[in-house]
Amino acid sequence: MVLRYNSPRLNILELVLLYVGFFSIGSLNLLQKRKATSDPYRRKNRFGKEPIGIISWWILGIALTYVVDISNLVIYALRVPNWWPCKTTVVCLILFLLFWIIVLISCADSKALPKNADSILKAYRLSVLYVWAIDIVFETIFIVYSPHPNETFQGIVLADHVARLVLCVFATAIYLTYRRKRHTHDPLDFEERQLTEESNVNENAISQNPSTVQLGVSASTSNFGTLKSTSKKPSDKSWAEYFRSFSTLLPYLWPTKDYRLQFQIFICIVLLFLGRAVNILAPRQLGVLTEKLTKHSEKIPWSDVILFVIYRFLQGNMGVIGSLRSFLWVPVSQYAYRAISTKALRHVLNLSYDFHLNKRAGEVLTALTKGSSLNTFAEQVVFQIGPVLLDLGVAMVYFFIKFDIYFTLIVLIMTLCYCYVTVKITSWRTEARRKMVNSWRESYAVQNDAIMNFETVKNFDADDFENERYGHAVDIYLKQERKVLFSLNFLNIVQGGIFTFSLAIACLLSAYRVTFGFNTVGDFVILLTYMIQLQQPLNFFGTLYRSLQNSIIDTERLLEIFEEKPTVVEKPNAPDLKVTQGKVIFSHVSFAYDPRKPVLSDINFVAQPGKVIALVGESGGGKSTIMRILLRFFDVNSGSITIDDQDIRNVTLSSLRSSIGVVPQDSTLFNDTILYNIKYAKPSATNEEIYAAAKAAQIHDRILQFPDGYNSRVGERGLKLSGGEKQRVAVARAILKDPSIILLDEATSALDTNTERQIQAALNRLASGRTAIVIAHRLSTITNADLILCISNGRIVETGTHEELIKRDGGAYKKMWFQQAMGKTSAETH
């Protein structure tokens, strides 16, 4: 007889070899879907597509040798009475066959591995090549110590060993040849390197300047006003990359300073292991109870019945242990949700102005609501994936001890097949669900745009257009949803088929053993109960994997937002701005949103303390940009801005912005009361201070005319108030803030002439003793300014007082003055 069928020690070594192989393949699958390489100068595949075919055929050949081995054993066992090889041999053959089938499927899966020999050999170097080398040693030992075959059965076994040895040596030779050729070939030639560099430069230019991406014009409303994304697809990430991304947020999930919550987490983990123990004791107790009942004893086994009921009462997520764990986990989950949600909002608010200019509010808000999904992801990994793996592992060990290694093999193969099918189908479903989620976000964003711009929609009578646009987005979402639901039902059918087939084999084998006296009826009950009990974690694994994928998809956008970095950041240990006088100096300041189109060029001026500086000029000339860079929404490209000889880039953003009061051209208010909106400038202000600020802004009497007075709600973005009322509320906020520097961006542009005079007087009082920079559309409002800067195409073309500029013949300011004067005279005439 050949050595392998008489030597359990060699079979044990085979199991060790098999473990190395399975562990390596598992590591490979964990890291799959990574890019083949990020090196732009990587060598080309010198073998082309041929090594893929050679490797695949080699793996198939190895698998077929084990098929021949198993078939040979079965035929010999049927021919020879009362003969069967040792169990370890059967298990080794089946597991090795399963191993090489997994390798073959993974190699053939284009998504699991790159499609070139270079990447295949790199990816499998740690998993398959080690198995090749070890297998060569084992096969050599088997062949050397095998006796001379005396019959066909032994000859076939020996031939299989020789075939595997030849295939392993052949595969190793291919790899060594590949390695030698790889090191002798030259890198990419100069032209290829140059083209690669140019391509990388273009890609970097696009990524750094998103505005260079062209807008696509389409008749479809789904592309209305959208940019084509050039970012990396989330599906290109591996599981390791996903866990690495999530790990950056784990500190916010762990209650670092709350020891009571930490103790509750410890109790939850203890309950988790207690639940696993009960999962063993419950079916075992049912088997014991069945054994006693089948003995036809006149004594009722009360203790066994009560013990079984207790186990059932404790078992499962609906049992006492599961319910207690869920109850104790509630405050931990709420802590994590609050930490993630507040962290997300804080991060978005800390992002620079350019992010908020390019964002879609609906999409960002949707992403921020997914903080619970991130919390769910962490909870699933710790308290759901762990228990499932423990239950399956404990079941295999228990079956091996209680019954037979064949039952362990059944559970193992069932688990592998079930998990593999679940992962593959779910991976296919993931892309469909990702499209569904993205289409839902798009429909939500369209709906949000229509509601947020309600007045514009009504002004242009665009109700039908918006309904059609939203309906088109909903149709796309429903189409993707149908695909997701179909794939879900298909997955359920396949999972049910795998479990039912495995259960049938286990029941038949157990029935055989009970029939011939190897096991008792109680053992059959234990097996059947435990197998049915295993269906729950297996089914739950499918649901869990889908839920895990869903959580990942739902939080992808949130993680992308967390990965966004502000372009304007404080220097480490930056001091607070100390405003003593309020002197503002712009020194050779240049700035551009897009490097191809400068907005400001060599801006120089000094705003003396207590003086009013007026900025006038054509729209788009850069006036508002001056205010933005003074508030440091953007950093200047060159030059510097100082306040009292302190560069604003060297101080904290909070101290800078708290020293500046702003009255914007288009004031936006929170959907709250008037009192809240005015008090927003100074949360510690008393009602008397608020009333005084409102009186100074000429809005107090108007507020008192509202039904609810200061408690009147202003509506979304202040739509319940007129433009003049909103502007006066903004002025009241600036007055209440009492800043050292005032920025007025056409603050009276939305007011009538009478109110403008009143507000102008209030603004003059506000600016008294403070540095004020005013953007003026109506030149009549800045005639008393201490310095007027006339800006055109990002440059200061004229400076002076009103009297000085009005006397300059051909000057830009004089032209604007007379144009407005003539327009006003013409309007009064008509």
Curated annotation (Swiss-Prot):
Would you list which residues are glycosylated? N150, N350
ABC transporter domain ranges (all copies): 584-818
Keyword annotations from UniProtKB, A to Z: ATP-binding, Cadmium resistance, Glycoprotein, Membrane, Nucleotide-binding, Signal, Transmembrane, Transmembrane helix, Transport, Vacuole
Q: Where mainly found?
A: membrane
Q: Membrane-spanning residues where? A: 51-71, 88-108, 126-146, 156-176, 263-283, 304-324, 381-401, 403-423, 490-511
PROSITE patterns attached to this UniProt entry: ABC_TM1F (PS50929), ABC_TRANSPORTER_1 (PS00211), ABC_TRANSPORTER_2 (PS50893)
A molecular function annotated in GO for this UniProt entry is:
ATP hydrolysis activity
**Binding site residues for glutathione:** R429, T430, E431, A432, R433, N492, I493, V494, Q495, G542
Signal sequence bounds: 1-27
Q: Which residues bind ATP?
A: Y593, G617, E618, S619, G620, G621, G622, K623, S624, T625, I626, M627, R628
One example of a Gene Ontology biological process annotation: phytochelatin import into vacuole
GO cellular-component terms in the record? fungal-type vacuole; fungal-type vacuole membrane; vacuolar membrane
Tell where it localizes.
Vacuole membrane
Superkingdom of the source?
Answer: Eukaryota
Instruction: Classify the protein's membrane topology as the record does.
Output: Multi-pass membrane protein
Q: What InterPro entries does the entry give?
A: AAA+_ATPase, ABC1_TM_dom, ABC1_TM_sf, ABC_transporter-like_ATP-bd, ABC_transporter-like_CS, P-loop_NTPase, Type_1_exporter
Gene3D superfamilies referenced in this protein's UniProt entry, alphabetically: ABC transporter type 1, transmembrane domain, P-loop containing nucleotide triphosphate hydrolases
Q: Which Pfam families match?
A: ABC_membrane, ABC_tran
Domain ABC transmembrane type-1, residue spans: 265-550
Family the UniProt entry places it in: Belongs to the ABC transporter superfamily. ABCB family. Heavy Metal importer (TC 3.A.1.210) subfamily.
* Function, in words: Involved in metal tolerance. Probably involved in the transport of metal-bound phytochelatins. Compartmentalizes cadmium within vacuoles, thereby protecting cells from cadmium toxicity.
What name does the UniProt record give this protein?
Heavy metal tolerance protein
Source species of the chain: Schizosaccharomyces pombe (strain 972 / ATCC 24843) (Fission yeast)
